């Protein structure tokens, strides 16, 4: 008779969880950041708020964003005037949009990831879906499973309302699933649409205005598994370790509340300071076991909550400007897509590394770090190992 120990050992994979494919997608509607203030104040019937518009223009100018993608078009907003008001009841209209569009956007990214992976959908064993855009039952994980479709026996996990750190969370979960289930192939999808957060401007809620200047729509899908099949599956990054922590004395720094008016965000000004003061502790805990203490020897993927966070992290750790190149590139071209951002950055990094002939998927370097920051303040830290490009 087989012992429990023998059975458990046979259930586990041998090698580390590995990213095997990445696919991304955005809505077709592209928004130019330089003209967005004029559009935003016009569509929300707020052109009389001239001083506030000037403030918003400065926010957009400082955002380091060139363009974003948004499902919400002028036509949709004209059909839903309450979404353009500052605090009008509008949750039903928002929900009607996102419960349909979030899985659809996720499907497009997933199809790209599956194509790169090169394996049949029937080999997907687990599905993890993450969004902060709307809530419904059956949830987005179920809707995506039906849209693709995948086998009815695929083991699903739905993550709602986690916010901007969750790109790290899904990698941590997928790592545990892949390493503890031999032969598992985990499809991870983060899909975010700003239809839940869009609203008109208000002088009394400037942190809401910050969100209007930063957030964009996007979905990213990743396939993760241990022990890649040689000659069939192509590894991109290995997930070596993953941790989550709460930043001390940071309660209330970032809050989000889903109410009749949609999802509202509230930010403390010192979010960049709180993150930059505490980030080195997470780095030391993650990299001391590997004997690494030179943060410039790593490749970097950091959630681009906004340029101030990136600037302060860079300054605090003495990072060379090129360390956050991929992160800033994604912020510039897509804005802050919440949980999907770090997965977009992974995709950008491996593509640029190959294009530039840098030797590894991590800009020619062996070890890297992925950071997610969000409500809590919560910090996710994932240690990555690159592979030959």
From Swiss-Prot:
InterPro entries: Chalcone/stilbene_synt_C, Chalcone/stilbene_synt_N, Chalcone/stilbene_synthase_AS, Polyketide_synthase_type-III, Thiolase-like. It is an enzyme of class 2 (transferase). GO terms for biological process: flavonoid biosynthetic process; polyketide biosynthetic process. The keyword Transferase applies. GO terms for molecular function: acyltransferase activity, transferring groups other than amino-acyl groups; naringenin-chalcone synthase activity. Pfam families: Chal_sti_synt_C, Chal_sti_synt_N. Belongs to the thiolase-like superfamily. Chalcone/stilbene synthases family. This is Chalcone synthase 1. It comes from Solanum lycopersicum.
